[in-house]
Amino acid sequence: PNGEKLGTYGVIKGASSFIGATVADTEFGLEALGYEFENLILYATYIGLGTVWLAATFSRGSFASAMKISEDELFPAISPVGYPIGKKSLKESVMRKIMKSDQRKPWDKLFFNNNFSTPLTEKESGIYLAPLEMLRLAPSATNAQPWRILKVKDIIHFYVSHNSNTRDEEKLIKRVDLGIGISHFHQVALEHGLSGDFKKLSQENIQVPENTKYIISWVTKDK
């Protein structure tokens, strides 16, 4: 699609090529979209292309029309694709400062051990130190880092957290963000030879904080 006709995209100028993804409104649809789309973004970066996740700053109506997206499909994000100029512009530097894109929450705000009252230390994370650190550094809309992780023995539970006044549309984006984080976790786990499966497990014996929703778990496979 033509960049000028399809709106303004933050600090992206002259963008004419975009990738976008839609998904049905299913239980894990948005998380799966975030996971797969981030894998694509990581590959594009690997081969030298410049990309920018856009989840709230693009003209959905124009793109939905150009991509012939049906009304029952969710269309949460796109990315322009091109060759990066290199040096950040003053405008981009200011935006990154405002959005705190170069900052991340510390471990004790994101990762917990056995219960949500006990922070997980890097030492206690064991073989999952690198995957969890890469999850911590993953990008998210407005750098909100909505993921919360509970480690119980060899099981990693993934949750999405939001404020009590978060709008429904923002909650959908946070689910996409969790998928992005899970992509980082999984790719690094695989690189380190860790094997496991994603499963939905009972939360009956876990006291989950308010405004925090369980999504899925990573169950380590015995070698």
Feature locations, PLM:
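Acidic, surface-exposed loops and disordered segments
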Residues: 1-223
